[in-house]
Regions:
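Intrinsic-disorder-associated interaction segments
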Residues: 4, 21-22, 26, 106-113
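Short, basic interhelical loop/turn and adjoining N-cap
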Residues: 2-13
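Residue-level detector of functionally special positions within alpha-helical transmembrane segments
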Residues: 7-9, 48, 138
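An internal, acidic/charged active-site-proximal segment
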Residues: 102-170
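A broad structural signal for alpha-helix termini and local helix breaks/kinks
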Residues: 3-4, 37, 128
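Active-site-proximal, Lys/Arg-enriched surface segment
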Residues: 14-95, 101
Length: 170
């Protein structure tokens, strides 16, 4: 379903005219969500990294990333998608796509990939917590550093355990 009357090229051209940095895309897209989703229902923030194939040597943040479709590491780019899910309406709207730095760039920043994902959520936590405190993610994120990191931000994780999970009873 389209939410505008113009083609994609029109939006891209007009939003790239020095104004891309001045738009708070999470707030903008949350305003769209308020219009098209039931904000009183059961909502969750979905996060999912997505691999994008890209060749070239000068593209910023190009590196090797996990491709779920290929079940292997691939050369290209990765974005982390943040979306708002309306559980009862079975619909979802994208809030923000955040580009993942390459492994080399993360090493320069003294960060791991998981720490980067936590930093992305922390960056938008103020706006996200106004809507919901539930984060939904795949099994990659069901590791202690990530769970503890988003818990510090005030979120709760809904995920499945990894195949390597070892459960102990206290």
């Amino acid at each position: 379903e389209r939410y505008g009357t113009h083609c994609e090229q029109t939006y891209r051209t007009n939003f790239n005219r020095g104004c891309a940095k001045c738009i708070d895309w999470v707030k903008f897209n949350l305003a769209l969500c308020r219009r098209y989703l039931n904000m009183d229902g059961l909502l969750a923030i979905a996060i999912d990294p997505s691999y994008i194939s890209k060749s070239g040597k000068k593209t910023p943040h190009i590196g090797t990333f996990w491709s779920g479709c290929a079940s292997s590491m691939k050369h290209g780019l990765e974005i982390m998608g943040l979306a708002l899910v309306d559980v009862h309406a079975n619909s979802c709207m994208m809030l923000r796509a955040h580009q993942t730095p390459s492994t080399g760039e993360l090493k320069l920043r003294n960060m791991t990939l998981v720490q980067h994902y936590i930093a992305v959520i922390k960056r938008y936590k103020k706006d996200l917590l106004k809507v919901t405190d539930i984060v939904v993610a795949d099994a990659f994120f069901s590791i202690r550093p990530f769970v503890d990191g988003i818990k510090e931000c005030g979120f709760h994780l809904v995920s499945r355990f990894r195949d390597t999970a070892s459960l102990y009873y206290v």
